Amino acid sequence: MCINVCYLGEVEYQEALFIQERIWALRVEKKIGDTLLLLEHPPVITIGRRGSKKNILVSDEFLKKMDVKVFEVSRGGDVTYHGPGQLVGYPIFDLALTDRDIKKFVYLLEEVFIRLLKDQFGKEAHRDENKYTGVWVGNDKIVAIGIAVKKWVTMHGFAFNVNTNLEHFSWIVPCGLKDRGVTSLERLIGSTIRFEDVVDKVQTYFGKVFGKSLNILGKEKLFDLLKI
């Protein structure tokens, strides 16, 4: 068993959602294997199933001026921000082939980044075992996680703040949590890191944590498989 992995670069949110949905349909039909999409989004705000527009702190006029779109989506969680310098991952995995354990799947997603941050950057990150999903450094979230599961196949996924402009999180109450902050890899290590290097590391740690080999696909190869 292997994981198909494709780095798409910067992709508009709606386009990425279309690609996810296409892969999801093929995964349900067993016509494609487990697939991990890695990408960046232009500035966008998404509202999960438990979310509220009340957690967007700026006006519609401000968002329009800044060319920031807002989408209500089917993932778990509340409000989050995506933008340049943030590595977004969409794992479309069939949980029916394992043990249909959604909590374990989220645990493994968190484990990818906990191990990566410790091994590669010497930073201690942790889960909030009692309350919230995601990966934290102290009281600050560095990886947000929100998934959806339909017919035991996952969609949506994680957002890893690499070189993200953290000021943009002031536009929202991140994940609806007023008493928590956000951080980035850049802030933790005190320097900007080459984004593609982080992509490579995340791919590697996905393989390690999920115990599978990787099938690295170019964008054209993926689109050929999807017939788009």
From Swiss-Prot:
Reactions listed under catalytic activity: octanoyl-[ACP] + L-lysyl-[protein] = N(6)-octanoyl-L-lysyl-[protein] + holo-[ACP] + H(+)
Molecular function in Gene Ontology: lipoyl(octanoyl) transferase activity
Q: Does the keyword Acyltransferase apply?
A: yes
Q: Which UniProt keywords apply?
A: Acyltransferase, Cytoplasm, Transferase
GO CC annotation terms, alphabetical? cytoplasm
Top-level EC class, please?
A: transferase
Name its GO BP terms in alphabetical order: protein modification process
The record's similarity note reads: Belongs to the LipB family.
Q: What else does the entry mention about this protein?
A: In the reaction, the free carboxyl group of octanoic acid is attached via an amide linkage to the epsilon-amino group of a specific lysine residue of lipoyl domains of lipoate-dependent enzymes.
NCBIfam families tied to this protein:
lipB (TIGR00214), PRK14345.1 (NF010925)
The protein depicted here goes by the name Octanoyltransferase
> What species is given as this protein's source?
Caldicellulosiruptor bescii (strain ATCC BAA-1888 / DSM 6725 / KCTC 15123 / Z-1320)
